[in-house]
């Protein structure tokens, strides 16, 4: 797909983007009415398995799912085959690299409790409801997120954090933390050996 044509589609759904947005492949970028989706300058979105040889399993998906939700992607951010899905809000700081197949999800997609889940199944809005637990995510500047990481609701990564491949991240982490594992934990600071 021609990226200039796709940029017109993005503008139609009120996606705001800066200069030099590079789209490789065919991402799915959608902004729900009443939400905010902003992409900074010099952002690269890879959405084709040939665009990143780490092995992309799906195309990039960037979606605001509820009125009032926001996704704010800073300048000079790169991503490959990433899913960014917001019901509340997700901020990604400038100069951040997001590895292949990473998921950044500010919600649980469904309640844990069976009774609440059953209410959601009967929801007249097709499950698009405030019954779904959600908390904003904030990723600082100059972060690196390794491939196949999952960033869960309520996570806050300080500037300069490094997230290891396959980590499942939840919680608040100080700047320059090296974060690995499932559940993810800080094993050291970036300047330490």
Predicted features and spans:
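Short glycine/proline- and charge-enriched loop/turn segments
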Residues: 117-128
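Domain-scale signature associated with acetyltransferase and cell-envelope carbohydrate enzymes
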Residues: 1-112, 123, 132-142, 149-151, ...
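Binuclear metal-ion centers of metallo-dependent hydrolases, dominated by the metallo-beta-lactamase
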Residues: 163
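Glycine-rich GHKL/ HATPase_c ATP-binding element in histidine kinases
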Residues: 167
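Extracellular carbohydrate recognition
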Residues: 155
């Amino acid at each position: 797909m021609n990226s200039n044509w796709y940029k017109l589609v993005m503008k139609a759904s009120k996606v705001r983007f800066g200069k030099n947005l590079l789209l490789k492949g065919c991402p799915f970028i959608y902004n729900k009415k009443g939400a905010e989706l902003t992409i900074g300058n010099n952002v690269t979105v890879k959405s084709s398995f040939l665009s990143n040889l780490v092995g992309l399993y799906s195309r990039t998906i960037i979606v605001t799912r509820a009125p009032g939700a926001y996704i704010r992607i800073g300048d000079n951010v790169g991503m490959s085959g990433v899913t960014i899905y917001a019901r509340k809000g997700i901020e990604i700081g400038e100069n951040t690299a997001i590895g292949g197949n990473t998921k950044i999800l500010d919600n649980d997609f469904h309640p844990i409790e069976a009774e609440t889940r059953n209410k959601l199944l009967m929801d007249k809005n097709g499950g698009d409801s405030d019954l779904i637990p959600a908390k904003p995510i904030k990723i600082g500047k100059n972060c690196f997120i390794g491939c196949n990481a999952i960033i869960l609701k309520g996570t806050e990564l300080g500037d300069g954090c490094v997230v290891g491949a396959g980590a499942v991240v939840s919680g608040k982490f100080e700047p320059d933390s090296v974060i690995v594992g499932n559940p993810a934990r800080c094993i050291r600071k970036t300047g330490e050996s």
